[in-house]
């Protein structure tokens, strides 16, 4: 086997919007409200091993905007990517899948959410950058430091 075949390999095969939904339960009346909405953002990361070296990473963003107690809108988007990861030590795959891949996908998710919100007639909401390393470390701590949050590339 040549040295080239044993070199670490990381490749983005595809980035795609897997799912998106937008609800405006109080439209059109909510557009007449003068109060600034409160905004809540949740982000989640999941990983699934599709083949020995191929992973689907899914970053889900949920944004809820409320004016008083009324929901102005609720949007959920799932940005996905298929990554080919080869010749990387097993202990490095989980951080790669839990930190590097979501960091690559998040700008696409942020753009898709911002676009949908403005197309729905609301002022733009720009999601702040997310420190996926901190989220990854927090998940590990919550799991009691179990070895490999996704030993076979399963959930984060």
Curated annotation (Swiss-Prot):
It is found in: Cytoplasm. Transmembrane segments: none annotated. InterPro entries: SecB, SecB-like_sf. SUPFAM superfamilies: SecB-like. It holds the Pfam family SecB. One of its GO terms (biological process) is protein folding. GO terms for cellular component: cytoplasm. Keywords: Chaperone, Cytoplasm, Protein transport, Translocation, Transport. GO terms for molecular function: unfolded protein binding. One of the proteins required for the normal export of preproteins out of the cell cytoplasm. It is a molecular chaperone that binds to a subset of precursor proteins, maintaining them in a translocation-competent state. It also specifically binds to its receptor SecA. Homotetramer, a dimer of dimers. One homotetramer interacts with 1 SecA dimer. Belongs to the SecB family. HAMAP family: SecB. This is Protein-export protein SecB. The gene is secB.
């Amino acid at each position: 086997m040549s040295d080239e075949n044993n070199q670490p390999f990381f490749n983005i095969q595809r980035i795609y919007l897997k799912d998106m939904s937008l609800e405006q339960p109080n439209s059109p009346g909510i557009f007449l409200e003068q109060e600034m909405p409160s905004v809540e953002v949740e982000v989640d990361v999941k990983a699934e091993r599709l083949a020995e070296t191929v992973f689907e990473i899914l970053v889900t963003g949920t944004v809820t905007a409320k004016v008083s107690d009324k929901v102005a809108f609720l949007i959920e988007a799932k940005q996905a990517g298929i990554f080919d990861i080869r010749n990387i030590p097993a202990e490095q795959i989980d951080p790669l899948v839990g930190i590097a891949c979501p960091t690559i996908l998040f700008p696409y998710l942020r753009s898709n959410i911002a676009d949908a919100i403005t197309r729905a007639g609301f002022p733009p909401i720009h999601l702040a950058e997310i420190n996926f390393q901190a989220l990854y470390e927090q998940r590990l701590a919550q799991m009691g430091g179990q070895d490999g949050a996704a030993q076979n590339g399963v959930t984060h």
